[in-house]
UniProtKB/Swiss-Prot annotation:
Lineage of origin: Archaea, Methanobacteriati, Methanobacteriota, Stenosarchaea group, Halobacteria
The keyword ATP-binding appears for this protein: no
Function: Involved in the assembly of a N-linked pentasaccharide that decorates the S-layer glycoprotein and flagellins. Adds the first hexose subunit of the pentasaccharide to the dolichol phosphate carrier.
Membrane topology: Multi-pass membrane protein
Protein name listed in UniProt: Glycosyltransferase AglJ
Entry-linked InterPro entries: GCTrfase_AglJ (IPR026456), Glyco_trans_2-like (IPR001173), Glycosyltransferase_2 (IPR050256), Nucleotide-diphossugar_trans (IPR029044)
Length: 303
């Protein structure tokens, strides 16, 4: 494990007064004196409690978890290693060692798998199902199985974080980081961690429907540069299938009932042509991406 003075504990917060002091104390008890809390404008005394517990507190200049994490790492953290966690008391401080160990073994990014030891009541059934679907979608689209891409418990080198292209301002930051790891070949591993229910009186800032939709859109949007065959091919397939369905309907109506549907026939042909073009565009984009990755690999080998 890196020495504690080489690690910054990063905790983005928004109205976590019920838990933040205990979270900071737990990590300081583990030997981590460098604790940074970046706060999104809490109104419940979170900042004051964090300062009293020994953390360095800054107020983020924007809004949203993603913006807070980017600002913290880029502007306020100088330590070579970062352990990022939520301030809601759901993660185990004693897991810090196994989260950080891989960073001295050649890995640049570590994801804490909440499903490895999830305590009763830690996640609702809806959230559990949604997480599973998102993880499977990520593995299918981006070709990597990180098991829990939405985990807020992350350890990473500051250098690898700065190499990522991150734009999400909200809860999509974890998804973006996972996609960037897959896209850029950042050495990533997953370690089992314990995940607890939020303490009584602590309210979540996550909306499962709204934020789940945002995460799905982020997965699809990021496929454009990581899996263009899926990005263009999925729409192309849907368009082609719709066009073929309409064409079969037109043919049936004309052959069986002697009824012609000229407008629907034109729409069906347009759908088929548009879909085939997108499919071909996806194939060509995938070929170009493969050649680009091969060239980048050769350049890295020469360096």
């Amino acid at each position: 494990m890196p020495t504690p003075d080489a690690v910054c504990i990063l905790t983005p917060t928004y109205n976590e007064a019920e838990t933040i002091a205990d979270v900071i104390s737990d990590y300081r008890d583990e030997g981590f004196a460098n604790v940074l809390v970046i706060d999104g404008g809490s109104t419940d005394g979170t900042r004051e409690l964090a300062e009293d517990a020994g953390a360095h507190v800054v107020v983020q200049s924007g809004s949203g978890k993603g913006q807070a994490v980017r600002e913290a790492v880029e502007d306020h953290i100088q330590a070579p290693y970062v352990l990022m966690l939520d301030g809601d008391g759901t993660y185990e401080a004693t897991d810090a060692t196994k989260m950080l160990d891989p960073l001295t073994e050649g890995y640049d990014h570590v994801i804490g798998d909440r499903f490895a030891d999830m305590r009763p009541g830690a996640m609702t059934r809806l959230n559990r199902v949604g997480n599973r679907i998102i993880n499977r979608a990520f593995a299918f689209i981006h070709g990597q199985d990180f098991r829990d891409i939405l985990s807020g418990y992350r350890a990473f080198t500051r250098e690898s974080f700065l190499d990522m292209t991150l734009t999400s301002d909200g809860f999509g930051i974890e998804t973006e980081m996972a996609v960037e790891c897959a896209k850029r070949g950042i050495k990533t591993t997953v370690v089992p961690t314990t995940y607890y229910p939020r303490p009584d009186g602590s309210d979540t800032n996550l909306d499962p429907i709204r934020d789940g939709g945002i995460i799905f859109l982020e997965l699809y949007r990021r496929a454009k540069t990581n899996n263009p065959l899926f990005y263009f091919g999925s729409v192309g397939f849907a368009s082609t299938a719709t066009g073929l369905g309409l064409a079969l309907y037109v043919a049936y109506e004309w052959v069986v009932r002697s009824i012609s549907h000229e407008v629907i026939a034109v729409v069906s042909m347009a759908g088929i042509l548009f879909g085939v073009q997108l499919l071909m565009f996806g194939v060509l984009s995938d070929l170009i991406l493969s050649l680009h990755r091969e060239q980048m690999k050769r350049i890295e080998e020469l360096e």
